[in-house]
Structure formats: structure tokens, C-alpha cells
Design a protein with these regions (language model features):
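Extracytoplasmic/secretory-pathway proteins
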Residues: 20-141, 146-690
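N-terminal signal peptide c-region/cleavage motif recognized by signal peptidases
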Residues: 13-17
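Sec-dependent signal peptide recognition
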Residues: 2-8
Length: 690
């Protein structure tokens, strides 16, 4: 079994995204989003770093005390050097106070307070210098850590608010001022400031004690346009999805208490829309629609989602309403040209939104921190797949998968396709699905949706011919496999991830006598192929099958043995799994609809065992004993004896094969081959079998 360990690594690398037990995206992302989640990050760091970049003429791109101090000294900037020294002292105190595993001692706290008081004193004397904004910010920071919140309110009001120029430093001071207001019980004023600064992280911190419908309802009654409400509504809706997702793992499902909580929220949302006090009814109506859908009222949800599209709200809220309407409509839709057109328009819009929100112009699900690319992903994995499979138009769903994380079409990057969602989806389908997709990319698209997809879908003919041919290899349909594989150039095969295995392993090697495994965990080097091993194999199998059909019994036994070897090697257990698949794992099993190469191997080893030749019979029995379809014994750990306890399975195929092998050996003393007599499994079996 050790020889499979390295290949199991390959499957993790190639298809890790699709493994249930490995890392991978959920594909059940939150759809409800009424603010950019980047707002939950620090809103000031990038602006601060831009200032450092400008100050050093691009030499230092982000805060680095030592590099910045060296630059300031080299420039002769005494004010900046003094400021950086104070800033470093402050940041060190912040880091020390943030330690959760090693809290500061009372002595350390006194020492830190003394340093903060010094920072406060020194910066107060530098409020008319060139760096007055930086020093004023540091002054307020020191006050904050000292708990002097009233001082910060007074300092902002009397000194900063009307006298300091607009800058990132002033915005940070205003943020600290808002925090001081919270400490003084003036939360509503603070919330307005946090909203103005797009500081959703602080809004969340401010609202830590409001999380249920009762709290949200109270806040709405007091302030129907509170800046905290969008955050609280989004949290409630997405928490509801989380609760539903978690309920799938228990027998009781969602509790009746929680269902009532959701129903109460829907009532609140509808009341908020009806009363007309909110400036953002789209927020509430969309929340109501999405909760209705998640909890099973799908037609009502669709009606509500369409109404939400007509209501007022921020641009983000209106986009959110559009996302929810799209998902619900696609989930409910009956296949028709009009639905195709609707879906095309909406998915085009969605892809453009994903590009807009991305900072680097990329929008695939895996490498971008992007809400809209995740919506695209969930749309494809859920309603689009369900809809087009049901409509027997799976090629449309397949084309959509190729848009999630588009594989490279460049020859040197052939390997990228095998780690894509497109490949995973195509691979778990059958050959008819692959043929339908190939026909789609080769044909003339009809309708708006098909044309849009056809322009963007992955269309490598080399990949598709190799893929379809390999699917036929897995079915044991050699002539049809050859027809497709012959169209694939060696240049393509030389770039595949399976190339090292294809170039170094032989399907004629007896797997029960010789293991063909890589020498290390290092990546195997590519091999320049001189022929397509899949075609070579298919032709040999056709030749063997032809000869087997006409051979006499003794000749047929030898041919059957060779045929059995090749069947095993082509199976998911074989060293030449690359003949029928693109990856291998110790967790692999026979796929539905594919040829059972292991069962075929067993059948032909049985035929080989009918030979009168001792060596052939011995090899056949040994091969049968090697195949662990039904193990000859099972082991359980016994804690009392602190050892393994084994129970034999006389009815298993492996037990019977080992019995025949040992019986053959005992009835032919002196003839046993060394590889049999030294086999650990045979030795263990003989101890049990007398």
C-alpha cells in the first residue's frame, strides 16, 4: 500500500478543491451583502502607507520603523525621527497590552502608563510643528490607552475639529473621538461618525450587545435609519443561513424557537417597509425575501424579491436585491428561451460587478477577496447546475464552470485545467456529458446565452479529445478511445501533470511482484514522450482480446495472465492509473458506469490458473491473493492486551486465493518460487492455515 502514498499527494494537489475532507471553498457563500466586506478591515492602513511611500520617494512602501528612521536621519529630518521614536514606543505598548497568553504585570503596567504619559506630554508640545497632525493623533492615541476619553472629546472639539486640515490623520482622530463618545454613553453620535468613515468594524464593536430580533426591533423603533441597522440586518440574515447549514448535521433540524425568531424578523422587515420611516426599504424587503426562500417559501420569496428591486436603498442594497432576485428566480425557473436571456443578462452583470469590486482586475473565486465572484460561484454550483441538468442541457452548466476559474489555454500551462472547477465537474460526469460539451464548443451557438458562453468557455480541442478518449479508456472501449486519442499531439501530453507517470511506468509489469513508485516526494520531472501510452495500451488490449478469442486452453492461460496484468495496472489500484484517469488517491473506488478492471483482472487470473504449468498456476494464484477485494483477515486493536487481534474470513476471495496458493506449494515441495516463499502475507497466512 505504500506505493499509493505519493500518488495520493497528487490528487490533493490536482483536485483538492473538490475533496469533501480537504480544504476548499464552500460553494454555499453568503449572498446577502449590503456593504463591501473590505470595510470590515482597517480603513486607514493603505492611506498611511501611501504617505510613507511618498515621504521616502518610494523607498519604503509600508510602515517599517527601522527603515523609516534611517531614512529620516539620512535626510536630516529631526522632527520625523523624534515622531518615529515616539510612535514606535506607542506601538510596542499596544502590542504588549494585546498579549493574551502573558498579561503585563502591575509593574509593567505602571511602566507603560509612564511611557504613555510621556508621549502625551511630548506630543502636546508639537502641535504647531510641520508634523502637528501626526503628533495630535499620537496624543489622542496615548489618551485612549490611558482611559482619558473625556480629554479626547475635549481635545477633538476644541483643537482638531475645525483647525486641522483634512487628512488620514484627522480621520483617525475622529475615529478615536467616536470611540470616546461610546465610552461616555453617546453611542448614536458615534455610530454616525463610524458610518461617515465607513468603519464597519467599529460599528460591529459598537453593536456587540444587539444580536436578536428584540434588540434590532428596539433600535429600529428608536432610530429607523440608524447606521447600525444595515450591519445588524445582514448579520441576522447570514446567521440564519449558518443556522440552516449547521442543522443539516443534526437530526432535529432547526429548532421551533429559531423558526419563530426568523418569522418575527420577517414581520419586523415587512413592518419597516410598510411604515415608510426607513430610507432604505430595499434592505428590509430583500432580507424578508431571502429568509422566506431559505425557510421554504420559494414562490412568496420570488414575489418579494421582485418588489425589492423597485425600492429605494443604497447602490449596494439595490445590487443586493438584484443578486437575491437572480438566485431565487433561477432556483424556481422552468427551462425556456426567456429564462436563458434573463440568466445571460444577469450573469453578465454579475461578472462585471465582480471585476469592479476586485482590486487587481481578477475575479475568480479562489484568488480574489470578492463577494460577487462568490455569488457567481454559488449560482453555478447550485441553481444553474440543477436547472440545466434537469433540462438535459448539461453542456450549459459545464460552460459556466469554465468561467469560475478559467483554465489557461497556453500549452505550457496545460496543467492548470486539471485543478479547475471545470475539470472537476466534467470529470465526475459521464462520457455523454463530455461529448455534449465538445459538441457545444465545436458547434454554432443558438440564442443569447449560448453565444455569450461560447465566446468565453474553455475550448481546447486537445484537452477535450484527450479527455473523451480517456473516458472511453475507463469504459474499456478501446477502438473509440483510439479514435479520439489519435487527435492529441504529443506536445500536449508532454505538458500534462500525469506526464512523469506516463513516461516512466509500464503496464506490462506484474503489479503483485514489482512496485513502480516515485523515488521521493519531490515533483517528478517531465518526460519527452515518443508515443501516446494510452493508444499503445488500447492497441495491445485489442490484440490480446483478439488472440484470446481463438487461442487453445494452454495458450489462452498465458494470454489471460498478460491481460489480467494490464487490467490491474489500468485500474484505480494500479500503478498505471493514468491510462484511465488523471489523478490517484488511496481513497479511490470504482466509479459508477466505468469498467471494473479489478474484477476483470480476477476473472482472467482464474483462467490463467487453469494452466497445467506449475509456474503459471503459481503466478496466477499469487496475483489473486494480492488483490484485496475481500481481505483474508480483519484486525481490531485490543486495549486490554495492547495488541492487534485478528479474525480470519475463510469466505473471502483473498483467503481462498491464499489457500489455493499454499495448497499448491505443499503439494509441490521444492518448486515454490522465492517471491512466494518470502512473501510476508503468505507467511502470516500459513501460521493461521494448517
Amino acid at each position: 500500500m505504500k506505493r499509493f502514498l505519493a500518488t495520493s499527494l497528487l490528487i490533493l494537489l490536482l483536485a483538492g478543491k473538490a475533496l469533501a475532507c480537504g480544504w476548499g471553498p464552500t460553494h454555499n457563500y453568503y449572498l446577502f451583502s449590503v456593504y463591501n466586506r473590505a470595510l470590515m478591515q482597517n480603513q486607514f492602513i493603505d492611506r498611511i502607507n501611501s504617505n510613507w511611500d511618498a515621504y521616502t520617494n518610494g523607498e519604503v512602501k509600508e510602515y517599517d520603523h527601522d527603515k523609516l528612521l534611517a531614512f529620516a536621519k539620512r535626510k536630516g529630518d529631526t522632527q520625523m525621527a523624534e515622531y518615529l521614536t515616539l510612535l514606535d514606543s506607542y506601538l510596542n505598548i499596544c502590542e504588549r497590552q494585546g498579549e493574551t497568553w502573558n498579561y503585563p504585570t502591575e509593574e509593567e503596567k505602571m511602566e507603560m502608563d509612564a511611557k504613555l504619559k510621556n508621549i502625551r506630554q511630548v506630543t502636546s508640545q508639537k502641535l504647531k510643528t510641520r508634523l502637528r497632525s501626526q503628533n495630535a493623533l499620537l496624543h489622542m492615541r496615548a489618551n485612549m490607552l490611558l482611559g482619558r476619553h473625556a480629554d479626547n472629546i475635549a481635545f477633538w472639539t476644541s483643537t482638531v475639529a475645525d483647525q486641522y486640515p483634512n487628512s488620514v490623520y484627522k480621520d483617525m482622530m475622529k475615529d478615536i473621538y467616536a470611540g470616546a463618545l461610546v465610552k461616555q454613553g453617546r453611542r448614536d453620535e458615534a455610530l454616525d461618525i463610524y458610518a461617515e468613515l465607513n468603519d464597519m468594524e467599529s460599528i460591529r464593536w459598537c453593536m456587540w450587545d444587539i444580536w436578536n430580533v428584540k434588540g434590532i426591533s428596539k433600535l429600529y423603533a428608536e432610530s429607523p435609519n440608524s447606521p447600525a441597522l444595515p450591519y445588524l440586518v445582514q448579520e441576522f440574515v447570514n446567521d440564519s443561513q449558518e443556522t440552516l447549514d449547521q442543522s443539516k448535521w443534526n437530526d432535529d433540524g432547526v429548532s421551533s424557537e429559531y423558526k419563530k425568531e426568523v418569522a418575527d424578523f420577517i414581520s419586523l422587515a415587512e413592518r419597516a417597509v410598510a411604515e415608510g420611516k426607513t430610507k432604505t426599504p430595499a434592505l428590509w424587503k430583500t432580507a424578508s425575501a431571502w429568509l422566506e426562500f431559505m425557510f421554504g417559501n420559494k414562490q412568496l420569496a420570488e414575489t418579494k424579491s421582485k418588489k425589492a428591486m423597485e425600492m429605494e436603498g443604497t447602490d449596494r442594497m439595490r445590487d443586493n436585491a438584484r443578486v437575491i432576485r437572480l438566485f431565487i428566480t433561477a432556483s424556481n425557473a422552468i427551462d425556456s428561451p426567456s429564462f436563458d436571456d434573463f440568466l445571460c443578462n444577469e450573469m453578465q452583470w454579475l461578472s462585471e460587478k465582480a471585476k469592479e469590486e476586485s482590486t487587481d482586475g481578477e475575479w475568480n473565486t479562489y484568488w480574489s477577496y470578492n463577494h460577487y465572484s462568490e455569488v457567481f460561484d454559488r449560482m453555478v454550483f447550485q441553481p444553474i447546475t440543477t436547472h440545466y441538468k434537469k433540462a438535459h442541457r448539461n453542456e450549459i452548466a459545464t460552460a459556466f464552470y469554465s468561467l469560475i476559474d478559467p483554465p489557461s489555454s497556453e500549452l505550457e500551462n496545460v496543467g492548470s485545467v486539471y485543478s479547475s472547477n471545470f475539470y472537476s465537474y466534467l470529470d465526475y460526469g459521464d462520457v455523454d456529458d463530455a461529448l455534449a460539451y465538445q459538441s457545444f464548443i465545436q458547434g454554432n451557438p443558438k440564442g443569447k446565452l449560448e453565444k455569450w458562453l461560447h465566446e468565453r468557455a474553455y475550448k481546447s480541442e486537445d484537452f477535450m479529445n484527450d479527455f473523451v478518449g480517456t473516458k472511453y479508456m475507463a469504459l474499456g472501449d478501446w477502438p473509440t478511445a483510439i479514435k479520439f486519442l489519435e487527435k492529441v499531439p504529443l506536445a500536449f501530453l508532454n505538458q500534462q501533470n500525469i506526464n512523469p507517470y506516463m513516461g516512466t511506468r509500464s503496464y506490462s509489469v506484474e503489479p503483485w511482484r514489482n512496485f513502480q513508485r516515485e523515488s521521493s516526494w519531490e515533483e517528478e520531472p517531465k518526460v519527452i514522450l515518443t508515443s501516446n501510452k494510452k493508444i499503445d495500451f488500447a492497441r495491445e488490449m485489442i490484440d490480446l482480446e483478439t488472440k484470446l478469442a481463438i487461442a487453445n486452453k494452454e495458450a489462452a492461460a498465458k494470454l489471460a495472465y498478460e491481460y489480467a496484468i494490464r487490467n490491474y495496472q489500468a485500474s484505480y489500484k494500479g500503478d498505471c492509473w493514468f491510462l484511465t484517469h488523471y489523478a490517484s488517491s488511496t481513497y479511490d473506488t470504482l466509479r459508477v458506469g466505468e469498467k471494473d478492471f479489478l474484477a476483470c483482472c480476477e476473472r482472467y487470473l482464474q483462467k490463467a490458473a487453469e494452466s497445467k504449468d506449475f509456474q503459471m498456476k503459481e503466478k496466477a494464484y499469487y496475483g489473486l491473493a494480492f488483490i484485496p477485494t475481500e481481505p483474508w483477515r480483519n484486525g481490531e486493536w485490543d486495549s486490554s492486551s495492547n495488541d492487534w487481534v485478528y479474525k480470519t474470513n475463510p469466505a473471502s476471495t483473498q483467503y481462498k486465493a491464499l489457500k489455493r496458493l499454499v495448497d499448491l506449494e505443499r503439494s509441490n515441495p521444492g518448486k515454490t518460487a522465492e517471491y512466494v516463499s518470502k512473501c510476508d502475507v503468505v507467511i502470516q497466512f500459513k501460521k493461521q492455515y494448517q
